[in-house]
Amino acid sequence: MTPLIIGVAGGSGSGKTTVARKIAEAVTPASVAFIDMDAYYRNHVELTLEERRRLNWDHPDAFDFDLLSRQLGALASGEAVEKPIYNFVSHLRDEKTLTIPAADVVVIDGILLFVDERVRERCDVKVFVDTDADVRLIRRIRRDMKRRGRPLEEILDQYLTSVQPMHLQFVEPSKRYADIIVPRGGHNTIAIDLITATILRRLHGSGS
């Protein structure tokens, strides 16, 4: 069976990770590997922590698309990869990596997943999760305060100076590359069921 790569894109806080994980759970008993694009932020060891904090993490230049494309290619060939682990406190990659084994289905999510042509073409099914801006902002605030220990003022400043402008410039336009657009994120169970059915049909077809 040729591995099937499912790409799930959408703005920060859109619910794309929830959608991606629900898809991954629903396609069992096929083996599934899950990858988050955030792991592929560039490793700016040459910068100070303060300089790294000021970087625009929502611009395509923030990501190591070369490495991501190579590793997706390896997974598509049935090989395991060593995925980077990104530390959002130090804004650096950890020395350790995470082994992602070969799998029947590879699900990857990320805000700019469809911006890079090489990565986009690696995805056999492209899903864009479309959620209102106010909902995305609230979710981002909750996530960054709880999981990443960031102060509210810093989160809002980043949203206004980079997250929102980059969403309009890069994320939203990438929606045109999607095969399927999911409104309302992880709450849209009908859309997720339809996506899952499509994936299962393709898996069955590739295995026949």
Language-model segments: residues:
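P-loop (Walker A) phosphate-binding loop of NTP-binding proteins
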Residues: G11
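Conserved lysine of the Walker
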Residues: K16
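Hydrophobic positions on the alpha1 helix immediately C-terminal to the Walker A/P-loop
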Residues: V19
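Post-Walker A helix-loop "phosphate-sensing" segment adjacent to the P-loop in P-loop NTPases
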Residues: E25-A33
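Conserved nucleotide-sensing/catalytic segment adjacent to the nucleotide-binding pocket
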Residues: A33-I35, R42-S90
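Phosphate-binding/switch loop-helix module in NTP-utilizing enzymes
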Residues: Q71-I108, L200, S206
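ATP-dependent NMP and nucleoside kinases share a basic, alpha-helical "lid"
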Residues: D94-R148
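NTP-dependent small-molecule kinase module
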Residues: P101-A102, Q164-S208
